[in-house]
Each structure stands twice: as structure tokens, then as C-alpha cells.
């Protein structure tokens, strides 16, 4: 046989071997396209319309502020061809999110139910499909209120639908488990981390469909890009039981740490499962090594260094899409937050998409992740009922949150509740159970809660934070600092944060004077929001015992029951509009204070173009040293910014008619902002 034939034969054998290896490993196929959607009352054979996922049926009613938006049952149906060669493997359907109760049927047979609208869930369909044929998949989703499903209340829309991706998953008969509460099946437990050494344990969940004892091998590689930093091999006997766990204990010397936005470095943890030297399954997870503490007097420390957590809260909906977001939408949100200089985020009030946690990992954003255990706040309703089914559902949602997101290095806090009340059914005993469960599932992360009142609830979690709206729902902005000082003095051992603070603003509501408005009114002037945030940030930043603060909210979001601001159905406390197109003046105040890299200058109140008074005050936000104000071509003086990146000119007299206002950075005259105003 000549050399050419030998080379060809070798190539063919390599291809066959590669195909065989790949076919033995798991396959994950996105099945978002071509679903038939109909409401439960639409029962005719011709009923329904074609939709692609992610999808919500509330983009028209809820987003237009209709209080009675559709909360009921929607049916999603699709036919899927199941390949004959998949027989003998294990098949699953994985849903990344469907709100809020979902029931899966395959070929008319009920497979299972998931109760909870924000975590991923998965069902095995191996024994219920016809191989080599098309199979009917039906998902019934119900977003009606359920007394045993969190949340019972919320100042946001409860959109219905399959609003995140759906995958068909095919694995070997023996595999790394995808059904451990829809987690990856691999938990990387950071037992201790320092600059000198990181000690870890990889807890790996396994499924044995053969139900026979087998000798197997696990190989785990820790890689820096493609460079292998550490490799461990574990030979073991897989028990005859369907489910089992194996642990690999390992350490890394002189690790490179995940260090927030300064250096969000992550290793790649690759776990491979072998059967008789044949690779049959692979899972890859991020590994960001870090250590952190929170001190009641001095705040938050990441890798031994103090880090002031400058955070925002984020809801997962937007104009036209509702909660049915694509990856580009999550990326756009992250880009806007990074532009402002955010280094922390509270993903409120529920588990959000994996894509968002991936982005917070990638960009070094310290993250507060939470379950939707939400109290009524200022509304008439109940957030907790002392029903065993409700309490079990809350525990399920906490287990899902922690197991599914365990390996995200950005997540530093597990949130247990928001604005609960002790009246009526008292949640204290239950919160204690949740707190204990969180520590059992994850001994490495602290728990946190968001409170809006005094009482025993504030002493149950490792950290506590308050939702404060001084200067919006009551009082004045300076009251925030007074509250923080009084609370810290009264309970110096408490680790205190600010979980929410904010004020509404419409970009269409402008006024010459600075005056507090009525929150429930149709008048939400932008300049009051700006003033509110200037004073609130001063109060927070000057108190080192505040471990973190989170603006409510980064973006305007939909809440159909609200009748205020410039239109119904919107909570306009965002620093950016619901469609992400306009950044309010408050955004630029924070950017000037939090982002010192991207130099800019911003003239506030530019949207107030029709003036009524001759003398005006002009405010500039800039992360440069100072600015010059030029009015109708003449300098009104130069000013250095104060320690809050702000310069103010008062009593500037304007002429009748048009006035051209220009501000220029004294550092770089290429940085400028201007507007034409009329009086």
C-alpha cells in the first residue's frame, strides 16, 4: 500500500473516530423556532399563530399599562424529529425560563410540572418519545397568581410565556447529570482562597442509566485559555444507582484572582467523563477565584482590599419585548452600566438570565442574586402565607438559584427577601429556614435581605440592606444620611447597605424651579430626580460603614398598575428610559463620579428649553478637573468641580429669545456640550 493510501486511510480513521467521539458526547440543540401559540380558550384545530422563542403574550396589554393584562394559560406546541440513532441515549428538554407554572406534555403524555417563573428547569423525555419519527411537544404555561408560588406580589409585570431559550439535550446513558435542579452538574466549591493558594473541591453529579456498577474515569483540567494549569484524574466505581456524586479535591498555587472590574480573570474548569478510555461527556464551567469579607464598620473588601460597591438594580424587561430578551439586549444593558461606571448590581427581584450572570462574571461586576420572595411594600397585599406548599416552593426556588448559579464568581450575595412585613402570617421562622438552607447549600457566600422597616427581620441574614426613598415617598434626601447614622449607632454590629434608593423622572417633564413633586401624580420633573441622586450619593459615599448601595433603578421598567409620570404602566425611576435610548441627567452625575476613565462633560437640564425666568442656574457634571460656562459667546467664568464631579453657576442672566449655552472642559477644549434655550 503506497504512502498516499496510508495517509488517506489514516485520515478516514481519524474522522470516523472523531465522529464516534462526538456522537458519544452530549448534544444541545436550540429549539426556539416555529412554535404554535394559542390561549387556552382557543380550541379549534386552526387556532394559534406561529411564534419564535423567547416569547411573552403580554407585549401589547401589559406594556400599554392595562391593569387587567392577560394572566392565564398559554399553550406552546411544536413537532420535533427524534433521530433513530438517539435510541439508547438520554433525552431532555431544558427550559431557561417560563412564567410562572409550566406543564410539559410529550405525545399527549404529561411529563412534569415546574412551579416558578424565573429559574431554569428540565425534564427527561427518554422513555416518552418515538425514535425515527416526529414527536409532539406541548407546553402549557400559566402566569395567573398562585397562592403557593413565589412571588405573590410585585411592583412589576408578571409576564406570561416561555420567555427564555429552550434546548433539546441528548446525552450518553451515563453522563454528568443535567437534572440536579437544572444545574451544570458540577459545583466548584472554593473552600479557601488567597494570593498564595486556592483550595477547592469539585462536586460532580452523575447519572447511571445502565443501573450497573461500572469502572469510570473523571478528568478535570483547569485552564488559563488553552494552557493547562492543573489536571486531576479520578478512577472510580460508579454505583448501580441512577444518581451519585464524586468529588475531586485540588488546589492551585499562586492563583490569578478574579478581581472585580480591575481584573475579572477566570480560569476554565473542564470536566470530562470517560468509559473505558472513551470520552462520553464534557462540562465546562467558569472558575473565578476570589475571597471577600464585609465589615460592619468599614464595608466590603474584595481580595483583601476595600471596594466601595457602586451599584444599581436591574429589572429584565424593556420596551416592545417585555421580558422576552435576546443576548444583544443583555449586552446592551451591560454596556450602558459599564459606561456609567457601575461595579456592583442587584438583579432584582428574581433570578435573571444566565446570559446576564455570564456578563457580570466577564466584566467583574459584584452581584447580588435573589429569589422572588417579595413583600407588599407600600401596597395592600400579602407577600407571605403560612402554607406548607408556599414554603416548599420558596425553598425550591432558593435551591434552583444557588445550584444553577453556584459557579458564577461575580455572585457574592444570596438575597432571601424584599420588603416583608411581620403582620398577619409572620415570616420570621420561615426566613430562618431559608437562611439555614442557603448556608447548607453554599457555606461560602453570605445571605442578604432588603428591608423597608424596623424589626426582627433585619437580624436574620448575614447582611442587611434598606430600601430608602427619602425625598421621594416621604421626607427629604438629607434624611437618608440621618437614617444610616441612627441605624449604625443603634446597631453597630449590623452590616448595613442600601438596597434601593431612587426617584421618578420623565424626560418630558421639565421645570425652572427645583421643587419636590407628588410621586403618585402625573408630574415627575427630571431635575428633582437629579437633585435627589446628588444628595443621596453624598450621604452614602461619606459613610464607610455602608457596605454597598444600589440605585433603584438602572432602567425604567413596566408596572401595569402604576398611574403616574408621563404615562400609565411605567415605573420611571430609571436612570435610563425604558427603551434604552435616553440617559437622564442623573446617569451623567453617576458617570462623572464613578467612571474616571472615559472623559466627558455634560450640561444638565438641557431638555428644559422653554424658560420662564431671566436668571438661571447651570449645573455641569464632568470627570475632568473643571469647566467654563459660555453664554451667547461670552464667558461666564471657569469653575473647578467639587468632590462630587459637579460645577454650578448661579444667577446667570439670559436675554429674551434664544440663548446659546456652551460648557467646555478646562482640561480639554475638545470636550464640550451645548444647547439653545429660549425665554
Predicted regions span which residues?
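Secreted/periplasmic carbohydrate-active enzymes, especially glycoside hydrolases
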Residues: 1-15, 22-349, 359, 363-367, ...
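Active-site/binding-pocket entry motifs
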Residues: 57, 293, 315-318, 470-472, ...
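Long, contiguous interaction/targeting segments characteristic
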Residues: 98-173, 517-590, 595
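Substrate-binding/catalytic cleft of secreted carbohydrate-active enzymes
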Residues: 334-337, 344-582, 586-590, 600-617, ...
Amino acid at each position: 500500500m503506497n504512502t498516499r493510501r496510508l495517509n488517506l486511510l489514516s485520515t478516514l480513521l481519524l474522522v470516523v473516530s472523531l465522529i464516534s467521539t462526538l456522537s458519544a458526547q452530549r448534544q444541545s440543540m436550540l429549539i426556539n423556532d416555529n412554535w404554535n401559540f394559542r390561549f387556552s380558550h382557543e380550541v379549534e384545530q386552526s387556532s394559534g399563530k406561529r411564534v419564535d422563542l423567547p416569547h411573552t403574550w403580554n407585549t401589547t396589554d401589559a406594556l400599554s399599562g392595562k391593569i387587567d393584562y392577560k394572566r392565564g394559560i398559554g399553550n406552546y406546541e411544536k413537532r420535533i424529529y427524534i433521530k433513530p440513532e438517539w435510541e439508547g441515549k438520554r433525552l431532555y428538554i431544558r427550559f431557561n425560563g417560563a412564567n410562572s407554572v409550566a406543564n410539559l406534555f410529550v405525545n399527549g403524555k404529561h411529563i412534569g410540572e415546574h412551579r416558578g417563573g424565573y429559574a431554569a428547569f428540565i425534564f427527561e423525555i427518554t422513555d416518552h418519545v418515538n425514535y425515527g419519527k416526529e414527536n409532539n411537544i406541548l407546553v402549557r404555561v400559566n402566569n395567573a397568581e398562585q397562592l403557593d408560588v413565589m412571588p405573590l406580589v410585585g411592583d412589576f409585570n408578571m409576564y406570561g410565556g416561555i420567555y427564555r431559550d429552550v434546548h433539546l439535550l441528548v446525552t450518553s446513558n451515563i453522563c454528568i447529570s443535567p437534572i440536579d435542579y437544572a444545574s451544570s452538574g458540577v459545583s466548584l466549591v472554593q473552600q479557601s482562597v488567597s494570593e498564595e493558594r486556592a483550595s477547592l473541591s469539585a462536586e460532580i453529579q452523575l447519572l447511571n442509566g445502565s443501573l450497573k456498577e461500572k469502572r469510570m474515569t473523571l478528568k478535570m483540567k483547569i485552564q488559563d485559555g488553552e494552557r493547562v494549569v492543573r489536571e486531576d484524574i479520578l478512577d472510580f466505581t460508579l454505583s448501580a444507582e441512577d444518581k451519585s456524586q464524586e468529588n475531586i479535591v485540588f488546589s492551585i498555587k499562586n492563583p490569578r484572582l478574579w478581581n472585580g472590574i480591575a481584573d475579572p480573570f477566570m480560569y476554565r474548569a473542564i470536566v470530562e467523563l470517560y468509559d473505558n478510555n472513551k470520552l462520553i461527556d464534557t462540562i465546562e464551567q467558569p472558575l473565578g477565584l476570589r475571597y471577600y469579607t464585609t465589615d460592619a464598620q468599614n464595608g466590603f473588601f474584595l481580595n483583601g482590599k476595600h471596594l466601595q460597591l457602586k451599584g444599581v438594580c436591574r429589572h429584565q424587561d424593556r420596551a416592545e419585548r417585555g421580558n422576552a430578551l435576546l443576548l444583544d439586549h443583555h449586552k446592551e444593558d451591560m454596556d450602558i452600566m459599564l459606561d456609567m461606571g457601575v461595579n456592583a448590581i442587584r438583579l432584582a427581584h428574581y433570578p435573571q438570565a444566565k446570559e446576564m450572570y455570564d456578563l457580570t462574571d466577564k466584566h467583574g461586576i459584584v452581584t447580588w442574586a435573589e429569589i422572588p420572595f417579595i413583600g407588599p411594600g407600600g401596597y395592600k397585599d400579602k407577600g407571605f402565607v403560612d402554607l406548607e406548599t408556599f414554603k416548599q416552593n420558596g425553598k425550591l426556588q432558593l435551591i434552583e438559584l444557588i445550584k444553577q448559579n453556584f459557579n458564577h464568581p461575580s455572585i457574592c450575595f444570596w438575597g432571601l427577601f424584599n420588603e416583608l412585613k411581620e403582620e398577619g402570617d409572620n415570616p420570621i421562622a420561615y426566613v430562618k429556614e431559608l437562611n439555614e438552607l442557603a448556608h447548607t447549600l453554599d457555606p461560602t457566600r453570605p445571605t442578604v435581605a432588603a428591608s423597608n422597616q424596623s424589626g426582627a427581620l433585619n437580624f436574620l441574614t448575614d447582611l442587611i440592606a434598606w430600601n430608602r426613598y427619602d425625598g421621594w415617598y416621604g421626607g427629604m434626601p438629607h434624611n437618608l444620611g440621618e437614617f444610616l447614622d441612627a441605624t449604625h449607632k443603634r446597631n453597630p454590629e449590623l452590616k448595613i447597605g442600601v438596597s434601593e434608593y431612587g426617584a421618578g423622572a420623565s424626560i418630558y417633564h421639565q421645570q425652572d424651579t427645583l421643587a419636590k413633586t407628588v410621586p403618585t401624580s402625573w408630574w415627575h420633573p427630571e431635575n428633582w430626580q437629579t437633585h435627589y441622586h446628588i444628595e443621596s450619593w453624598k450621604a452614602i459615599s461619606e459613610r464607610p460603614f455602608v457596605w454597598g448601595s444600589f440605585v433603584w433603578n438602572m432602567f425604567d421598567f413596566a408596572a401595569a398598575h402604576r398611574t403616574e409620570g408621563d404615562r400609565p404602566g411605567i415605573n420611571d425611576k430609571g436612570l435610563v428610559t425604558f427603551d434604552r435610548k435616553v440617559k437622564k441627567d442623573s446617569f451623567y452625575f453617576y458617570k462623572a463620579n464613578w467612571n474616571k476613565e472615559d472623559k466627558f462633560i455634560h450640561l444638565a437640564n438641557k431638555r428644559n428649553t422653554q424658560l420662564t425666568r431671566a436668571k438661571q442656574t447651570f449645573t455641569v457634571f464632568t470627570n475632568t478637573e473643571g469647566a467654563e460656562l459660555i453664554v451667547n459667546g461670552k464667558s461666564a467664568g471657569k469653575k473647578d468641580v467639587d468632590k462630587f464631579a459637579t460645577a454650578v453657576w448661579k444667577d446667570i442672566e439670559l436675554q429674551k429669545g434664544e440663548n446659546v449655552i456652551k460648557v467646555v472642559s478646562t482640561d480639554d477644549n475638545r470636550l464640550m456640550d451645548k444647547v439653545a434655550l429660549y425665554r
